[in-house]
Structure formats: C-alpha cells, structure tokens
Amino acid sequence: MAVLGVDVGGTFTDAVVLDGGRVTTAKVLTSARQEESVIAAARAAGAENVERFAHGTTVATNALLERKGARTAFVTTVGFEHLLHLRRQTRAHLYRPCAAWPEPLVPLERSHGVRGRIGPAGELEPLDLDTLPQIDAEAVAVCLLHAYRDATHERAVAEELRLRLPHAHVVASHEVAPEFREYERASTTAADAYLGPVVSGYLHALSAAAASAGLPAPLVMRSSGGVATPAEAAEHPATILVSGPAAGVVGAARLAALAGNENAIAFDMGGTSTDVCLIADSHAERASERTIAGVPIRLPTVDLHTVGAGGGSIVWRDAGGALRVGPQSAGADPGPACYGRGGTQPTVTDANLLLGRLPDTLAGGVELDRAAAERALAGIDPAAVVDVVNAEMLRALRVVSVQRGHDPAAFALVAYGGAGPLHACELADELGITTVIVPEAAGVLSALGLVVSDERRDAVRSYLVPLAEAGELPPAGEADLRYEGQSFELTVPLQDDLAEAFHRAHAEQYGFAEREREIELVAVRTADIRPGPDLDLPRTEQTTVAGPSLLALPGATCWLAPGWVGARDGRMLRLTKQ
C-alpha cells in the first residue's frame, strides 16, 4: 500500500508517493481553494491504493498573516480586558521606540471581563456568570487569571458560552496552553479561537474531497513535527501554524539519518525566506514558543530560525549606498527579472544566473532570460549579491549552532528548497562544515517529510514548585527548570538526577552553575508518539562529479563549488569538501 504526503506552499503544491521503495513526485500550482490543489497534486503523483495520507497546509498561517480569521471575542477576569493590547513592554527593535505593533486579533470593544478570581490558595472571589455580557462572535477565547493552576472558573465560563453560542468556536486557555505567563497564554488562546472556523472549514472540505478521490482522511502536520487527525487539528488550529516548514525539518532529519549523519543542520531556502533548524541525535531542536505575524504562540514547535532571504529576494541599496538583499521578494509573479514575466527588479536568482550557477531552462520548462537579468543588475556585481545573501543566511545558521554552544563543523548541512542547494557549498565553507547532503527530491522535501512523519500528541503540566517537592515525575519527557528568582527557564530531558542535569545545562548555556541554589520546576512536557513509516528510498548506481559543476534536481539546481566532490546514488547527493 502507498503512503502519500502533500505540502501546500504559497506558489506550488508538492506531492510525494512512497510505494514499496518506489518514489513518485509531483508539483502543481497552488489555487485559491487549497483542497483542489491537494487533490490535483495527489493525482499528478499517481496516488492509488493509499493507506496513509499526511498533509501540510498554509491555511492557518495565511489567515493569521492576512488577518482573515473569525470575528473573535475575548473573555478574561474583570479588570484585565486590555491584556491583549498592553502586551509585553519589550521591543523587537531596541532602537525603534516608535515602531508600530501589529493590531491585536481581538479589538477592545469585543474584550469582556467576568467577575470571579482564583488566587494562590484557591478561590478569592466566587465566579459570577451574571456579569458575563451577551456576546456576538464567531469565536470566543477565554483566559482567566491563574487558570493554568485551577481551571474551575474558566471551565464554567467556557461551558456557559458554548450553551449561549452553540455554533461559535469557544477555546479556553487551559485546553490549549495551560502555562503561566498571562499574556502569552491569552495570545495563544486568542489565536486558537481566531483560526478555528477558518481551519475547521478547510479541513472539512479537504476531508470530503479526499473521500471523493478515494483517499483516506488526511493527517495534518503540526508545528511540533508530528501529525494529528483532522479533528484534533481543527480543535486547536494554532498547533499547525508552522506545518510545512516543520515537515521539511522532519524530512531533513530522516534523510540525514539515512546518510549516517545523526547531527545535521536543516537549511531550507525558498523564494522569499530561509528556515534553518539544528538536528541533534536525529531529532530536531524544539521550542515552546514562537512569534508568528506579531502574535506570540506558546505551543510546542520545531525550533526554526527564519530570515527574509530567498531566491526571489530583491536587491537594493540603502541610504548609505550599501548593498542589501530582502526581505522584499519578487514572488512568483512577476518573479525575478530572468523569468521574463515583466519583473524589472534585481533578485538573487538573477545574480546566480549571471554567475553561471543556473541552467538556461529550469524544471517545468521555464526559460531564463539572461539579458533581462543583466538589465536588472546593471551596475551591481552579481558576486556581491551572493555574498550579501550568504551573510544573511550565515547569521541564521550561527544562531542555531554557534550561539547555542554547538560547533557547526561537527554537523552535516542538509540543503533543500528551490534555492538551498545553490548556496550550500559556500555556506559550508564559511562554517567549516565538510559534508553537505542534498536530497534528490530537494524541491519537495517537505512532502517527503510528511510521508514519514510520526503521529505526535504533546501535553504540558505546570508545577511552579521547588524541584525537591515536585514528587514523582513521568519517566520520559522534558522539564522546564530555573534557579529560584530567575525569570526564564532551561528545558532539560527528564532523567534520574534532574538537578545535576540542570546544573550542567546552566553551565553550558551561561558559563556557571550555582549548585547550592534551590531549583524550581516550572513545567513538565510529555509527548505520545506513534512512529511513522520507514524511509525506504530506491538507490541507483553511484556516480561521482567534481566541482565546479551544475547538477540538476527535480525542482532545484545544485551548485557544486570548486574543491567539492559530489556522490549521487538516486536518493541524495552527498557533497564532500576535499
């Protein structure tokens, strides 16, 4: 029986079918109705007798970016109605005191307070549901003070709202993010409610379309790097905000392990941005929070670091005349000047073409216009453009490696996406990396990651007690720990001597440990994991090529720089520094 993975991107929808060691791929244009693109891609890949169907989508991300979610109300403890608007008083850019904040997902006129208060020792003020006003909304987020510790009041408010508004998507904070830090919990709950009707409608339409096409119900990739049922994804859609990129990291980790590299750095360079993620012992590094479209999301996610540099990034000069690349992008339409679709602004792709790093015709029959690229880059050195964009990506790669205490030379670089293999060798040279792995399916690796993804269900429990008083903990998972009086935590795998593990982690991160100081257990994170299919890729007779050379891949081109040798076996290109 076959296994199908379909990943929807902004421009293309990719499909991979794995059937008894035979791999079939397809790439179709993404339409406004994503479910139509999914079925079209599955058919193009020849999906038949499919036993398992996994899916990555941008529906939730697009709705949040474009602010096209449901009409949402916010209910909190009386006196805290401004919580989503006050935010944290930190600034993303320290020297921009007047920088504008994104608008909250819920306007102040739809933010309501209800009387009742939970304190450290229990109930301080009884809940008064009569103070809950009449609400007219498609979705409601409920976040009462200290509900992560005692959800009695919050549960009662949510039940009352579900009775009053039977067709609304009602989310309570203890159901989605039962952790302390009021603003992040409220922000996550608001996003979960805001996205609910949009994602639920899409997944219902996709499930119906899949059934009509003879496909099983789709499993949906979550930001955590595992798939869940459509019902689970629709219930808490904030969990699928990094769906596609997470699938790419899963694919990179599995492919690196197949090549014998348990430690790797995933490097996904697309048209508008680049995502990087550290993989240690064949597992992607994880984070418990991520900001998306200006909204903090306190949910498990693969620890991606993103920069606005991609193949379609526009080249420009700042007020001082310095060359800059991105974050603006030419997109797919009109695209880079060399696409011949009316684009006139210079891009990274135009520079790569003029440097001889791209063929005259791309996959899909797109003929590149060298003269148009020369006109767009008039007066600009193409090599300087590549140097600038490489510098942007090097910073991202160092963030996930050097800045976290890892020597990148001890890792392989897994390069994928449409533009990743073009820049991989030069980036590896700068970081001292001697092995680069380029998937044969570099342009559709996220879809391949979906094919082999695990089913994963994450849970978190807040403690906020001295570690010595925590009692028995689960045998497996992670613990958020800190010294008493600290504001932030370190996450350490659960083990017998958890205190000693935390001291070591603190010393590695900050250069010192205070073994006489009391340790506080903040939260414990666990995951229920059901392993996905094995990655069984067909091999061909190995061929070897030395750089400089261009190697064509489905949906991508690999630039083999001087001093590098590539071995190709039908599954991947393994590039080695000589």
What are these regions (language model features)?
Residues M1-A73, E125-A141, E154-S173, P197-H204, ...:
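N-terminal glycine/serine-rich phosphate-binding loop of ATP-dependent small-molecule kinases
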Residues E35, A45, S173-R181, R185-T188, ...:
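ATP-dependent carbohydrate kinase catalytic cores
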Residues V17-L18, L65-A70, T76, L83-T90, ...:
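Short acidic, glycine/serine/threonine-rich loops at helix termini
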Residues V8, Q134-E138, A205, N261, ...:
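C-terminal, non-catalytic interaction/recognition modules in large multi-subunit enzymes and RNPs
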Residues A70-I118, S173-A177, G449:
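Active-site phosphate-binding/coordination module
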Residues V6-E36, P104-A121, E367-L368, D454-L464:
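Short glycine-rich, Thr/Ser-proximal phosphate-binding strand/loop in the N-terminal lobe
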Residues C143-T189, A193, L521-D536, D569, ...:
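Terminal amphipathic helices with adjacent charged low-complexity linkers/tails
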